[in-house]
Amino acid sequence: MQETTILILGAGAWGASLANLALANGHRVRVWSRRGTETLAALLEDVDIILSAISMKGVREVASQIQSLTPSPETIFVTATKGLEPETIYTPSQIWQSCFPNHPVVVLSGPNLSKEIDQSLPAATVVASRIATAAATVQLAFSSSRFRVYTNPDPIGVELGGTLKNVIAIASGVCDGLHLGTNAKAALVTRGLTEMVRIGNCWGAKTETFYGLSGLGDLLATCNSPLSRNYQVGYQLAGGQTLAQILAKLPGTAEGVNTCQVLVQLARQQNIVIPITEQVYRLLQGEVTPQQALDELMLRDIKPEYN
């Protein structure tokens, strides 16, 4: 395998996990963080891949900083951030592509809980790009006997799968926190996936992408693991804590909280029916209790499963 120089943006749990995967494959790895002492300008020198694992709120600022430094035209950008920009409703890859229109941008997303990756437990992920050679380069850089990487030509679908499932994960935490049982959980995850597909189709994503690792796979992992911050938000809301109390002690960012608000705004503009997401939004806003949100979902007008 050809040795590659990779710059990881973000020294949080996910950034550190990805850095370790690349190091284990023999690549040269540099890590940038806001608290670090090295400048972006110094770290960018002779870099082949720039991988962003920063939180959604920092993406545009960091992309703009790198834009001003004029990276090599051969540099591949990879985004492993899951979220939406509130002002533009852009995904992370759309922000990177708008800043670097002549560079390949690759999305990395899948059912990847960083703690399990760090324990070398087997996992799989997806790298997606319109530029097949760029996706293949990233695939080779991160694939190993414990981390299987697939390519996909639908970057927006792969990216939205990882982003939209965070909202359903909050609902899943509520479901478990209220002890609603396996039947309710199965119904919630399945109907949540339907909402993800509806929103994704509006964006031009392929339906089948949502039934792959970055959609259903990530949804199942996040909705069933206490390791998920979004799941924890829902679980603790069901336990009677306020959103402010939960976020104050949460390690890291629960992107689903911000994503939910953006999705509801989009759905109302585009007339997309997303009842689970709507109830999560109302719960986060303090407009309903977890039990009231459940009742409103169960008492909706009856209808066919598929329109």
From Swiss-Prot:
Is the keyword Secreted assigned to this protein? no
Q: What is its EC number?
A: 1.1.1.94
What name does the UniProt record give this protein? Glycerol-3-phosphate dehydrogenase [NAD(P)+]
Q: Which HAMAP family match?
A: NAD_Glyc3P_dehydrog (MF_00394)
- Catalyzed chemical reaction(s): sn-glycerol 3-phosphate + NAD(+) = dihydroxyacetone phosphate + NADH + H(+); sn-glycerol 3-phosphate + NADP(+) = dihydroxyacetone phosphate + NADPH + H(+)
Task: List, alphabetically, the GO terms of the cellular component aspect.
Answer: cytosol
Which PANTHER family would you find in this protein's record?
GLYCEROL-3-PHOSPHATE DEHYDROGENASE, GLYCEROL-3-PHOSPHATE DEHYDROGENASE [NAD(+)] 2, CHLOROPLASTIC
Q: Which GO terms describe its molecular function?
A: glycerol-3-phosphate dehydrogenase [NAD(P)+] activity; NAD binding
- Keywords in UniProt for this one? Cytoplasm, Lipid biosynthesis, Lipid metabolism, NAD, NADP, Nucleotide-binding, Oxidoreductase, Phospholipid biosynthesis, Phospholipid metabolism
Q: Which residues bind NADPH?
A: 14, 34-35, 82, 114, 229, 255
Q: Which domain of life is it from?
A: Bacteria
Tell whether Disulfide bond is among the UniProt keywords: no
